[in-house]
């Protein structure tokens, strides 16, 4: 069994959890069909608006339809995670690692993705309107049908990405 130490930022943030005020290590396992991420039970579709998950390792997590509106995910590792249909409205994903993540039809309106790594991410049909994509790595990402209107993407790297209209960026 993997063990993770939890910081106080996670305490009380989720519907079911295993944190203590001392930050003791918590086991990772499956509980009643839910997924355990960093020792905290999180189900797909969980409501976690405004939660502080900065620096969290959520790589490979199954978090379909999760609500992380206004959440702080600064420097979080979400690589390879299934975040399809997730809500990241106004979320802070500064320097987050979303490489290879599934973000199909995710709602990222006004999210801060400055310096984020989204290489190889699947953003098919995602709403990225009004996002901050400064220095964001979107190499080889799939943006087919995505909404990039009003996004600040002047320094984003789209090398090899499939653009919203289905064309390949050079």
Protein language model features and the residues they cover:
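C-terminal motif of bacterial Sec signal peptides marking the signal peptidase cleavage site
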Residues: 15-18
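Tandem repeat scaffolds
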Residues: 21-170
């Amino acid at each position: 069994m993997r063990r993770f130490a939890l910081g106080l930022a996670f305490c009380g943030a989720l519907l079911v959890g295993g944190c203590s005020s001392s930050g003791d290590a918590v086991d990772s396992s499956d509980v009643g069909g839910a997924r355990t991420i960093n020792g905290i039970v999180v189900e797909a579709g969980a409501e976690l608006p405004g939660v502080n998950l900065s620096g969290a390792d959520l790589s490979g997590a199954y978090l379909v339809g999760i609500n992380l509106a206004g959440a702080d995910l600064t420097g979080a590792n979400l690589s390879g995670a299934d975040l399809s249909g997730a809500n990241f409205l106004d979320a802070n994903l500064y320097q987050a690692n979303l490489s290879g993540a599934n973000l199909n039809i995710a709602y990222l309106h006004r999210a801060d993705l400055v310096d984020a790594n989204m290489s190889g991410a699947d953003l098919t049909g995602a709403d990225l309107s009004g996002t901050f994509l400064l220095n964001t790595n979107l190499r080889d990402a799939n943006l087919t049908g995505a909404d990039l209107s009003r996004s600040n993407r002047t320094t984003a790297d789209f090398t090899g990405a499939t653009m919203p209209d289905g064309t390949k960026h050079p």
